[in-house]
Curated annotation (Swiss-Prot):
The chain crosses the membrane at residues 202-222. It is a single-pass membrane protein. Its main location: membrane. It comes from Schizosaccharomyces pombe (strain 972 / ATCC 24843). The keyword Calcium does not apply. Residues 223-287 are cytoplasmic. The keyword Signal applies. Keywords: Glycoprotein, Membrane, Signal, Transmembrane, Transmembrane helix. Residues 1-20 form the signal peptide. Coiled coil: none annotated. This is Uncharacterized membrane protein P31B10.04.
Amino acid sequence: MKVICGSVFLFSLFFQVVLGDYFSSSSGNPNLRTTKVYTVVSGTHLATAESTVSKTITTTKGLPTNAYYNCVPSKYIQSDIPMCAPNQGDRWVKGRKYKVSWDPLYFGVDNLLMVVSYLNDSGLIAATKKVQNSKGEIMLKANKGWLHDDSFQNVTIDLVTISENNMTLLTGPRILLAKDLDSATAAAENAAFYGPRRNIKAAIAVPSVILGLILVALVYYAYRKDTWKIYMAKIRIRRSAPGYGVRRSRRQRMQSRPVAYTSLPADAHFEDSDDEDYYQSQVKKFH
């Protein structure tokens, strides 16, 4: 009993240490975070209010106690940015989808506003999207409109919490948005992401040709097999026909000839005639 109680005590102590390490100060992050406050001016711009606020890190409302997330403090792109993707300096290409992930336990709201901001002094926003905080990640498609007819744009992926009339903005990773890539770079990235490119036409044509050759060989074999059977049957018919055979002995050939009389039958008799010539020609006339 003492051994069991001791094991239970050690297990509970280990459990408390692990949970305390994860949830205390969001695993190494400061309890207070100073950030700029932004106010919505229009649908396309943000104007800064030169002041700061302190934000206490809290857990998300309504999350189950056994919730599991892939984005944890040990995977943050920076210790002060509770996001795991994308990484700083990643390159995005228009028209493709990319993962954006964050730590839901860091924020104290049910919903977040994701903002794609241009990295310049204009304060122009490329896009905004409302997301559910508890999901922890979304797939974001790089829109060609974000480029504003340029080949490249530097943008940041920011997360915003809304409180009353103000927005608390957490500046996220910086990425390079590209219009397109050269063929060599695009092929290398596609191979790294999707695997080696396969020639679909060759993958279809080569097996088709091989199957066609096999089919022709089978048809030819079947034809030759039937022809050989017919030829052998003809040979057997010829061998079984009457007459001289190539493998019949002389004795067998002689036995197959019609029977010839070697002596006169008992009922045979001669006719007498005074004409000697006639007699000579009719010596053995049978009745």
